[in-house]
Every structure is written in structure tokens, then in C-alpha cells.
A protein has these predicted regions:
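Hinge/cleft segment of the Venus flytrap/periplasmic-binding protein
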Residues: 2-4, 143, 151, 162-163, ...
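Extracytoplasmic "Venus flytrap"
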Residues: 5-24, 28, 36-53, 70-75, ...
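Short, solvent-exposed amphipathic alpha-helices that sit
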Residues: 17-32, 51, 122-126, 150-167, ...
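Short beta-strand elements in bilobed, periplasmic/extracellular small-molecule ligand-binding domains
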Residues: 30-45, 139-142, 160-182, 231-232
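Hydrophobic alpha-helical segments within soluble ligand-binding/sensing domains
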Residues: 48, 52, 113-140, 181, ...
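Short acidic/histidine-rich motifs immediately flanking catalytic phosphotransfer sites
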Residues: 52-67, 194-200
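Hydrophobic alpha-helical
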Residues: 69-87, 159, 170, 174-246
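Flexible loop/hinge segments that line or gate small-molecule binding clefts
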Residues: 79-121, 241-246
Length: 302
């Protein structure tokens, strides 16, 4: 069999999880002995669609055997998926479980499946972290991912399942990047309501946004006010060994949630499916883990 060629389509390189996803894809390609081309959509769903269609519509000898896609927009590019399927290109979706997968799988030509983090459970863990860090209750400033993101919506829903009634949450919107969170928090700080909010914890749906929030508070002009904000616990999510876990050890974050990288998992499933001529399980989830463990957080605050 000729060396397999995979196209890996990711959001961009503006947060640590996306960078780690790309690095994981490169390492997995070396391990599996396949070629992997990584393309970055620069957080633009139209750009992502155009990049993928160009590859799908290229000469047969230069087409990828499979595409691994982490969708930027609210949909997982159903028309592009159909074009890939018609061209005999495998299709793996990361962090979504789109409805169109079942239809494409019934056609049975190539592997079609999804691998995602368990976003509801991520949210539930965040809610439990809040309870551990604020045993007497209080107010949380919570930075969500973009409105279009089902991952963000599910994390929020999970968090709301597990926070106790003595914790109130004020929500801001970010775009998974440090810069977006810095802008959101800086704008919020200009509102009179920010001064009366009595925030006791700052949380974000990823580590990059949590660190971006810290950056906004570092820019507060008043020394006493700045020190008060920076003394609060900050929590995030992604928990990669080279970023989020380091920030926890350095006490820049009080907690994060470790998420296994998805690109390598999807690539391994694709290689096995292509070589064995099988159709993988339609959807599988990875397991998130609190860092530090929840009982350790409780012990820190008791």
C-alpha cells in the first residue's frame, strides 16, 4: 500500500490547545509512517471550507486519503463532507458529533466518524471546581467560548448542572484565545457593574482565555485594585503539560481540566479503518480530568 496522506484542518495557532493538536498530528504521522499536511483556517469557517474543497477537488493522485477536521463554525461543513465522501476520502470530525455522519456512514465507502471531548462533563467538572474553591459561595466571572460553538454551549450547560445554589455566575464571551478574553474583560471593567460585582473567582472555558483574563487585570491602573483582582483564583480548561499544567504549578491558575489531544486518536482510527476496510464506531469521547484532583482542591481550601 502506498503511504497514506492525511489532511489535518485546525482552527489556527492562537491558543495552546490548537498548537498542541498540530504537534500531536505531526508526532502521530511519524509514528504511523504516514504523511500529514496541517492547514490552519485562521478561525475563518469560509477559509476552512475553501481549503478543504481545494484538496478534495485536486487531481486524484494528490488528494488526501482522509481529512481530520476540527470545525471553526457552528456546522461541521456538511456539504464539504459529502464532497469528500463522494471522492472516496475518509472524514473524521473533532469536537463535534454532526447529524450527517449517519447518512454518510450508510453509504459505506470510506471511514466516517467523530471523536470529541466530553464537553458536558468538562462543564460539570468546572462547576465542581468552583464549589471546591468557593466553599462559602460567591460570584464567578465566567468567560465562555463563542456563541456558535456547541462545545462552549455544552460546557456551560454542564457547569450549570453542578454549581451549588450559593454561587452566582456572570458570563462574558471570548473566542478561545487570550486576546479575545483580554478584550472582553477590559470592556467589562469599564462598566460600573464590575465595581459592585464582588467577584470571588475568574474562570474560562479554556486556559488561553483564563490567562487572557489575567492579562486584562494586570493592566488595571490602580495598584490596590490590580492586586485584588490578581489575588483571586483563576481556572481554565485544556490542561496541556506544556501550558495549562505549568500555569497551575506556577499558581497563575488555581485549576484546569486536562483534555486528551484528539488529532492523534482520530489518525490512528483512520489508519486502522483504511487498512482493515472497516467502519469505526460513529462517535467516541475522551475523558476529562481535573488538575489538580477535586479532593486536592477541597483540601487546599479547608
Amino acid at each position: 500500500m502506498n503511504k497514506l496522506r492525511f489532511l489535518i484542518s485546525l482552527h489556527g495557532n492562537q491558543n495552546d490547545f490548537q498548537v498542541a493538536q498540530a504537534q500531536c498530528a505531526e508526532a502521530t504521522a511519524r509514528k504511523l509512517g504516514i504523511n500529514a499536511e496541517i492547514v490552519l483556517a485562521e478561525d475563518d469557517p469560509v477559509n476552512q471550507s475553501t481549503q478543504l474543497l481545494k484538496a478534495i477537488q485536486s487531481q486524484k493522485e494528490s488528494r488526501p486519503n482522509a481529512i481530520v477536521l476540527e470545525p471553526v463554525g457552528g456546522t461541521a461543513l456538511p456539504q464539504v463532507a459529502k464532497a469528500a465522501n463522494a471522492a472516496g476520502i475518509g472524514w473524521a470530525v473533532l469536537n463535534r458529533h454532526p447529524e450527517y455522519l449517519a447518512e454518510l456512514r450508510r453509504q459505506g465507502r470510506v471511514p466516517v466518524f467523530a471523536v470529541s471531548a466530553d464537553h458536558e462533563e468538562i462543564g460539570r467538572i468546572q462547576g465542581r471546581q468552583f464549589a471546591a474553591l468557593l466553599p462559602r459561595g460567591g460570584s464567578v466571572l465566567y468567560i465562555e467560548g463563542p456563541t456558535r460553538s456547541s462545545s462552549a454551549q455544552k460546557r456551560t450547560a454542564g457547569m450549570q448542572e453542578t454549581i451549588p445554589s450559593n454561587i452566582q455566575v456572570s458570563m462574558l464571551k471570548g473566542n478561545w484565545t487570550a486576546e479575545s478574553a483580554t478584550r472582553a474583560v477590559s470592556s467589562w471593567l469599564k462598566l460600573s457593574t464590575s465595581r459592585s460585582a464582588q467577584i470571588a473567582l475568574v474562570a474560562a472555558q479554556d486556559d488561553a482565555m483564563a490567562m487572557g483574563a489575567r492579562q486584562a487585570f494586570q493592566q488595571v491602573a490602580d495598584d490596590q485594585e490590580r492586586a485584588r483582582w490578581l489575588s483571586l483564583p483563576f481556572t481554565g480548561c485544556d490542561g496541556q503539560p506544556a501550558s495549562g499544567q505549568v500555569w497551575v504549578r506556577d499558581k497563575l491558575l488555581a485549576a484546569t481540566i486536562y483534555l486528551p489531544l484528539l488529532t492523534g486518536i482520530a489518525m490512528e482510527i483512520l489508519v486502522a479503518a483504511i487498512r482493515d476496510g472497516t467502519q469505526p464506531q460513529e462517535h467516541s469521547c475522551t475523558t476529562p480530568v481535573s488538575v489538580p484532583a477535586l479532593d486536592a482542591l477541597v483540601a487546599q481550601r479547608s
